[in-house]
Amino acid sequence: MNYEGHLKGHRGWVTSLACPQQAGSYIKVVSTSRDGTAISWKANPDRHSVDSDYGLPSHRLEGHTGFVSCVSLAHATDYALTASWDRSIRMWDLRNGQCQRKFLKHTKDVLAVAFSPDDRLIVSAGRDNVIRVWNVAGECMHEFLRDGHEDWVSSICFSPSLEHPIVVSGSWDNTIKVWNVNGGKCERTLKGHSNYVSTVTVSPDGSLCASGGKDGAALLWDLSTGEQLFKINVESPINQIAFSPNRFWMCVATERSLSVYDLESKAVIAELTPDGAKPSECISIAWSADGNTLYSGHKDNLIRVWSISDAE
């Protein structure tokens, strides 16, 4: 993979990244930061080298009064959700950068938020240990309380299935839980981590779940059975994991490294470091919809951009 350049505009750690799923979107990526803002980024038409900015801010989304911890993009519309330590979720129109709606019910910092695959539901979680399901009008429809997590819920995502909607959550209680959205029932609890879980993600086909956390282990699970398929020890606390949308690859961001693994061989196929520099810790990652570009967010306030070469 090749280093293409950076995006510069945040004044704090880049905490979360998300890429549009619509083909041909002029927005390349949306980022959130500890500076209390989110930014939607467009291509830089005047870029001539990796030393110039890879992209330019399209809109800066301002309004939160605390760190912004997570962003999720609608699959078929130009809307984004942001979660914040100010205990709120906001919905934004990316066409004009305006806040359209606030979601207020969490009693502590909100750490994670996600759109459902059909964009009709929203799920959120945070330091009050409660997972909440909302409609897009801002009404809280369900709270997952029975068999819930016993500590902060740090990460949450939907499976891509519309027929059997599932939510997966990761927590500081060292577990992952799989939830039926319609009934709010915990279908299974996945145990395998020896310390808190910081990230969970579901594969594009909905068959696999990957989790990572403080113990430095990336675990791969069969989502339908809850079976742990294998473990990759990266020997450093894991900040985020992301499946490639079109290759059997998994990117893992840790305190020490940013690596891409081939899931068949379980081998590292790329260690991502810009030429001549050792970047600061990577805490967020996102693949473009076509799988040809990877964005990484860092503690030095920069977003770095990587491309896949033709040989890969």
Swiss-Prot record:
CDD domains: WD40 (cd00200). Keywords: Repeat, Ribonucleoprotein, Ribosomal protein, WD repeat. InterPro entries: G-protein_beta_WD-40_rep (IPR020472), RACK1-like (IPR045223), WD40/YVTN_repeat-like_dom_sf (IPR015943), WD40_repeat_CS (IPR019775), WD40_repeat_dom_sf (IPR036322), WD40_rpt (IPR001680). The keyword Transmembrane helix does not apply. Pfam families: WD40. The keyword Kinase does not apply. GO terms for molecular function: ribosome binding; translation regulator activity. PROSITE patterns: WD_REPEATS_1, WD_REPEATS_2, WD_REPEATS_REGION. WD repeats lie at residues 9-42, 63-93, 105-135, 148-180, 192-222, 233-262, 279-307. GO terms for cellular component: ribonucleoprotein complex; ribosome. Belongs to the WD repeat G protein beta family. Ribosomal protein RACK1 subfamily. This is Small ribosomal subunit protein RACK1. The gene is LACK1.
